[in-house]
């Protein structure tokens, strides 16, 4: 192999590496959002269940849900968007 082929091969490998990194970052963000949404769904279900059982909502669960929603709003302000709305 001459030097031109080696440089070309190196450029191709670097481009592939960048593509792989971009894909994995996107997958990580989607998984993180999915886990957050599942946690919110569980909290909502627990609040509803407790409201049906006792006639009122649990303040702790409601506060935790509010914290998660606020965290989601903060993430949207820094550029991470909810893909389900797109």
From Swiss-Prot:
GO biological process: receptor catabolic process; symbiont-mediated suppression of host innate immune response; symbiont-mediated suppression of host type I interferon-mediated signaling pathway; symbiont-mediated-mediated suppression of host tetherin activity; viral release from host cell
UniProt topological domain (Cytoplasmic) ranges: 30-86
TM ranges: 9-29
Entry comment, domain topic: The N-terminus and transmembrane domains are required for self-oligomerization and proper virion budding, whereas the cytoplasmic domain is required for CD4 degradation. The cytoplasmic domain is composed of 2 amphipathic alpha helix that form a U-shape.
Extracellular side: 1-8
PTM description: Phosphorylated by host CK2. This phosphorylation is necessary for interaction with human BTRC and degradation of CD4.
Function: Enhances virion budding by targeting host CD4 and Tetherin/BST2 to proteasome degradation. Degradation of CD4 prevents any unwanted premature interactions between viral Env and its host receptor CD4 in the endoplasmic reticulum. Degradation of antiretroviral protein Tetherin/BST2 is important for virion budding, as BST2 tethers new viral particles to the host cell membrane. Mechanistically, Vpu bridges either CD4 or BST2 to BTRC, a substrate recognition subunit of the Skp1/Cullin/F-box protein E3 ubiquitin ligase, induces their ubiquitination and subsequent proteasomal degradation.
Coiled coil start-end: none
Locations listed in the record: Host membrane
InterPro entries in UniProt: Vpu, Vpu_cyt_dom_sf
Protein name per its UniProtKB record: Protein Vpu
Gene Ontology CC entries for this record: host cell membrane; membrane
Gene Ontology MF terms in the entry: CD4 receptor binding; monoatomic cation channel activity
Topology with respect to the bilayer: Single-pass type I membrane protein
Cysteine pairings via disulfide bonds: none
Sites of Phosphoserine modification: 54, 58
Pfam families: Vpu
Subunit structure: Homopentamer. Interacts with host CD4 and BRTC; these interactions induce proteasomal degradation of CD4. Interacts with host BST2; this interaction leads to the degradation of host BST2. Interacts with host FBXW11. Interacts with host AP1M1; this interaction plays a role in the mistrafficking and subsequent degradation of host BST2. Interacts with host RANBP2; this interaction allows Vpu to down-regulate host BLM sumoylation. Forms pentamers or hexamers. Interacts with host CD4 and BRTC; these interactions induce proteasomal degradation of CD4.
Gene name for this UniProt entry: vpu
Note: HIV-1 lineages are divided in three main groups, M (for Major), O (for Outlier), and N (for New, or Non-M, Non-O). The vast majority of strains found worldwide belong to the group M. Group O seems to be endemic to and largely confined to Cameroon and neighboring countries in West Central Africa, where these viruses represent a small minority of HIV-1 strains. The group N is represented by a limited number of isolates from Cameroonian persons. The group M is further subdivided in 9 clades or subtypes (A to D, F to H, J and K).
Activity modulation comment: Ion channel activity is inhibited by hexamethylene amiloride in vitro.
Principal subcellular localisation of the protein: host cell
Family: Belongs to the HIV-1 VPU protein family.
Keyword Cytoplasm: no
Lineage: Viruses, Riboviria, Pararnavirae, Artverviricota, Revtraviricetes
Keyword annotations: AIDS, Apoptosis, Host membrane, Host-virus interaction, Inhibition of host innate immune response by virus, Inhibition of host tetherin by virus, Ion channel, Ion transport, Membrane, Phosphoprotein, Transmembrane, Transmembrane helix, Transport, Viral immunoevasion
